UniProtKB/Swiss-Prot annotation:
Enzyme class: oxidoreductase
Gene name of the record: Ogd
Protein name per the record: Prolyl 3,4-dihydroxylase OGFOD1
Cofactor(s) listed: Fe(2+); L-ascorbate
Domain called Fe2OG dioxygenase: residue spans: 114-221
GO molecular function, one term: L-ascorbic acid binding
Organism: Ostreococcus tauri
Pfam families in alphabetical order: 2OG-FeII_Oxy_4, Ofd1_CTDD
Catalytic activity: [ribosomal protein uS12]-L-proline + 2-oxoglutarate + O2 = [ribosomal protein uS12]-(3S)-3-hydroxy-L-proline + succinate + CO2; [ribosomal protein uS12]-(3S)-3-hydroxy-L-proline + 2-oxoglutarate + O2 = [ribosomal protein uS12]-(3S)-3,4-dihydroxy-L-proline + succinate + CO2
Entry EC number(s): 1.14.11.-
SMART domains (alphabetical): P4Hc
Family: Belongs to the TPA1 family.
Biological process according to GO: peptidyl-proline di-hydroxylation
Lineage: Eukaryota, Viridiplantae, Chlorophyta, Mamiellophyceae, Mamiellales
UniProt subunit comment: Monomer and homodimer.
Binding, Fe cation: H132, D134, H200
Amino acid sequence: MPDHIYSHSFAQFLRNADNSVVNINPYPYVAFEDVFDDTFLRECLKELKSYLTAHFKETDLFKVFQTTDLANLEDCIRDAHTNVPNLIRLREHLYSPGFRGFVSTVTGTGPLDGAVDCSCNIYTSGCHLLCHDDVIGTRKISYIIYLSDPDCDWLAVDGGQLELYASDRRTVPTHTPVVSILPSWNSMVMFEVSPGRSFHAVREVSAEMKTRVSISGWFHTKERHIKRNQRETSTLDQLHSMIPATHAEWAVLHVNRVLSPSYSLVQDLTKWINPEYLRSESVKRVRQVFEADGSVQLFNFLLPHIAEPIKRKLNREDCRNSRHRCMYDHGYGDSWVVQGPPHVQRYLSYQPLECTLANKRSNSGELLKKLMCDLFESSSFQNWVRAVTGSVCDLAHSEVRRFRPGFDYTLAHAGTKRCSSEIDVTLCLTSGPNPAEWLSGDLGGFKCFIPIGSKSDRADVYEEIGEEQNMRSVTPSFNCLSLVKVNTGIGDFVKYVSTSAKSSRWDIVCRYST
């Protein structure tokens, strides 16, 4: 195998390679440093910056800039062999029989196919890739070559680490990663793609002046007789059979079938709700909007003397936790329980076993729990929902949630697809020092409702969300109640909350089956 593109030390290793360098925990992977000749790799980076166009892509799973597949360099770049000769050489060496044989030897896998499957991924500040296992089609080995700035060391505080997750006996990833690898210049990571094992993520890049650049791709197995169900199993499809995401139990609510709020109903709600939303004219107007659009947002929903103490309490909680924001377990405790698994979701749910007087006085979760129980789970509120939506509500799932910056999200997948119509009622209590920052969407934390498609084993199974998909998005805003009609076949997600957010997304969510 030609070795003139490699560093001297790596070229020597290539000639005597074995699998002794493989780490086995949490699953087989190998990490190399000083892989390529420094001058050669700098030329690759220069060509990449000069001739390749990176397109912004964002879904529930990731936020990244990505170039075209490097297999298509000759089709995308005029005079490619003249303008990007080093990128072409790199691609040809990576998928040459010699290097594929080296990968097979080091990883202990069987023969690998020569099909080129790689691209350049660019992570600027705020970009991320959430937990998944890469299982699509015939992928066998995943690899990443890092081309971040060669003249500026990458530090842990910059984010962008490749994170590897362990799995339990049910092939479900643990809540937090066990291995973290910095995207250092001229390093390379490889790991075997394995269903229910090779869970990994790219932590959000938090450095404003650094860019995480990598060439990543897959080596595919040569075996053409893989069982059909194994070959077509993607991370998205596996969510049908995985251990379900954790959440609170559903509760039966006994709803009086009234067409509009009665006097006693209104009296019960005047202690909590802005009186504007209790007037008969307003109820009719809200219902008209809801029936026409399928959703409505009601701002300043709670009375000021209810909302303001909540805001102060939640802001203090975010400030109190700010010193530990880099730690995955920050915010745990006081009956706040992490909900997972992380290839489906990660957020904190308030689930008290019992409430002591101390908890009532000091715990922000208990404050929200009381609001949920006294207002949202009351028959008066349920009948108000009936009046403003025109829907009879029979079942409800209610929950107090916290989505922490830099950690938390939910993903859209088959498990969130509704089998029957529902009314999603969410009181968002997100504030922070500058609430307007949430409006752009750059901080994440918004809630989306989208159609959930059928199974697929395509490499782009996590498709970009386009306007043609009739996506409905609700931006986080303090003291805002949103009501959304969720039809059969629709799923939802809460977009990952960026580390740049100054506060968590706090909410109380209720789902009514209609």
